[in-house]
Amino acid sequence: MPRCTLRFEKALHRDGAERIAGIDEAGRGPLAGPVVAAAVILPPRFSLPGLTDSKLLSAQVREEFYLELTTDEKIEFGVGIASVDEIDRLNILRASYLAMERAVSSLRAAPGHLLIDGLPVPVFSFPQTAIVRGDMRSLSIAAASVIAKVTRDRMMLSWHEEFPVYQFCDNKGYGTPEHLASLRTHGPCPLHRRSFAPVAQTYFPFA
């Protein structure tokens, strides 16, 4: 497993870059709920042992890291959300880009360079570096992945109270067998992405 460090951030600093922001998103794959992105600028000597891709962490550890990341005054972060309606209207890729744009726009000031997990994001005019498996290699991206994931999970937990038959508290909108069974029985709710095939193939009691 790659080590998650500040080596990318430090290399950019040596080249003169300032305000280096890691960006990641959560929620591209689920059948329900928004897509959420986060942008994070870490201080130069930042350390948080164990921080890595949010998908590799337990829910409890994610929450602990989220609290540390969002209460440290030396850490700057922004969150952006694209709604279910925007996902259905734009498609999930463009909605993900929109969430990332909103996350960057909510930083206190514009970043000087972006570190992005996976592939380049064409909507940004800022200099950017795309890093394969970046959420396991760059601490800035890993921090963004945790903030985005916990933010989205908390939203899905709150919506479980309104739509308990879909068990969003457990599946967070992903297409588990139980979730698919609930879709077949009850049809989609307003949180479901109607442009996604498993949802589009069911009836719409809320239409």
Spans of features found by a protein language model:
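RNase H-like, Mg2+-dependent phosphodiesterase core
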Residues: 1-207
